[in-house]
A protein has these predicted regions:
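Beta-strand/loop-dominated core regions that host nucleotide or nucleotide-derived cofactor-binding catalytic loops
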Residues: 74-176
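Conserved, mostly hydrophobic/aromatic
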Residues: 9, 34, 66, 118, ...
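Glycine-enriched alpha-helix->loop->beta-strand junction motifs that scaffold or abut catalytic
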Residues: 27-30, 183-185, 206, 233-238
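Short beta-strand/loop segments at the ligand-binding rim of alpha/beta enzyme cores
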Residues: 2-7, 60-62, 158, 162-163, ...
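Hydrophobic faces of well-ordered beta-strands that scaffold small-molecule active sites
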Residues: 6-8, 31-33, 63-65, 187, ...
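Active-site-adjacent beta->alpha loops and helix N-cap segments on the catalytic face
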Residues: 17, 38-50, 192-207, 226
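Conserved small/polar residues in nucleotide/adenosyl-binding loops
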Residues: 244-251
Length: 251
């Protein structure tokens, strides 16, 4: 029996019956659906297709719902994007402005309260690395540690912080109810920071008919690493995310 399982993300290239059939025959064990993108209608089509093919092949392919998780994003720029260079100064602000070469708005109103000087902010999946130099009013004035192209509505991650928010957003709750209705097998919980995050998710699933759904906690920040042992006490498994391109910038 093969103990290592293969998880495959189902996207535009694979959401076809012939492609999915070949993937299952090649060894796919779990079909992952990324709820950071797509509507419930689109995901319903994928789930129906997975169930159809696994029944046809008599293969017990599991379905994993990967949550969007707590979402922190920058807003928009005047021209849609900018170029940042190493050593530049760039400001994140909670003021509602249209971004430019010097600053951009964020969607998290408590950003300034939660940050401190020296904290790092990873933007656009870690391609852009900022380090907080000064906190002033509604602004976090940052040094650009790793530059690159930065465009509208890119994600932000805070690897060394536990941000003060409720773990389950309204969208996550809606997605989880959708997953319970469709009898998914696993929930991959994004940006788990503490054991309590998993406990909150477990309670929500249990209270809404999802007692049989197993939780895979995704470790994506420093707090998750620091609390991984206690997270493992309550989660059914963990998944780690590795930003290998960040290694050259570690201190």
């Amino acid at each position: 029996m093969r103990k290592t399982k293969i998880i495959c993300t189902i996207g535009p290239a694979s959401e076809h019956e012939d492609v999915l059939t070949r993937m299952i025959k090649a060894g796919m064990d779990v079909a992952r659906l990324n709820f950071s993108h797509g509507s419930h209608e689109e995901h319903q089509g994928k789930i129906d297709l997975i169930k159809k093919v696994r029944q046809k092949l008599h293969m017990p392919i599991a379905i994993m719902l990967d949550t969007k998780g707590p979402e922190y994003r920058i807003k928009t720029f005047e021209n849609g994007k900018i170029e940042l260079k190493d050593g530049d100064t760039f400001t994140l602000t909670t003021d509602d402005i249209v971004g430019n070469q010097e600053r951009v708005s964020v969607n998290y109103e408590n950003l300034i309260k939660d940050l401190k000087v020296g904290d790092r902010v990873l933007v656009a999946n870690g391609i852009i690395i900022l380090q907080v130099r000064e906190l002033k009013g509604n602004d976090a004035i940052c040094d650009v540690i790793a530059g690159g192209t930065l465009s509208d509505r890119k994600s932000m991650n805070f690897p060394n912080k536990v941000m003060k928010h409720a773990y389950l957003s309204k969208q996550d709750k809606d997605d989880l109810l959708f997953g319970i209705k469709n009898e998914v097998d696993y929930v991959a919980a994004s940006f788990v920071s503490t054991k309590q995050d998993v406990a909150d998710l477990r309670s929500f699933l249990d209270e809404n008919g999802g007692e049989d759904i197993e939780i895979i906690a995704k470790i994506e920040n420093r707090s998750g690493v620091d609390h991984v042992e206690e997270i493992c006490e309550i989660a059914n498994g963990i998944m780690t995310v590795s930003y290998t391109h960040l290694r050259a910038h570690e201190t």
